[in-house]
Regions:
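Primarily single-stranded nucleic-acid-binding OB-fold modules
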Residues: 1-78
């Protein structure tokens, strides 16, 4: 049986932070794979989840690269 595929969630508190959005796309493009990348925008009640059009390979290299731009608490694998 194949395990349920995981999803990578990246939380961006400020939806207007284009620098982080660009960084996210760059990192994702460097780690292509089969898993979905979900971008969570905003805070608390105002959160919006967007499924990114590209898929990634959820590996340590990917999360490490993301941690350079995002707080570790902003990156989750579920």
């Amino acid at each position: 049986s194949t395990p349920m595929s995981q999803k990578l969630f990246v939380h961006l508190k400020d939806p207007n932070d284009s620098e982080k959005l660009i960084a996210l796309k760059k990192v994702a493009s460097e780690h292509p794979g089969q898993e979905e990348l979900i971008l969570v925008l905003g805070e608390a009640a105002q959160k919006t989840a967007l499924r990114m059009p590209f898929k990634v390979a959820i590996k340590d290299e990917l999360t490490t690269a993301l941690h350079e731009f995002f707080d570790p608490t902003a990156v989750a694998i579920k």
